[in-house]
A protein has these predicted regions:
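Sec-dependent bacterial lipoprotein signal peptides
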Residues: 1-16
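Lipid interaction determinants
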Residues: 18-77, 83-136
Length: 136
């Protein structure tokens, strides 16, 4: 009698330990290190950035005021998901999620178009940009 009860309790504990939310989808092609540059002649302030998308659903993006990436503006960290051509970025401490349409130009180049910007972002203009994989 005790053995079935222990098995049942163990199974219940195991199931309770599982997340009730499914794992968030991550487009595996986006994992890794990337670099981008905002258009110097575009509607928004010029800057460059390095971004890192990790398999644990975390991202880090460092923004620089120069092409050489020596004058750091700021670094943002947060969570990301990406699937079906949409990349969602939620920066730590910011309630609004930024959403981008994306498409691969080739295995190491991704084109993004902003469709939902963070209201605290430096530029609210719709814009597109390209990121290039680093170190491959």
């Amino acid at each position: 009698m005790l053995k079935p009860l222990l098995i049942g309790a163990s199974l219940a504990a195991l199931l309770a330990g599982c997340s009730s939310h499914p794992a968030q989808p991550l487009d595996q092609r986006l994992l890794g290190e990337w670099q981008g540059t905002r258009d110097k002649n575009g509607p928004c302030q010029f800057f460059t950035w390095n971004s890192s998308f990790r398999a644990d659903g975390r991202f880090e993006i460092s923004f620089f005021a120069d092409e050489q990436r020596t004058r750091l503006i700021q670094t943002e960290r947060g969570t990301w998901t990406a699937h079906y051509g949409k990349n969602h970025l939620t920066t730590d401490g910011v309630k609004t999620t930024e959403v981008y349409d994306y498409r691969f130009v080739d295995a190491d180049t991704v084109e993004y178009v902003s469709i939902k910007a963070d209201p605290t972002a430096d530029c609210q203009a719709d814009y597109r940009f390209t990121e290039h994989r680093v170190g491959r």
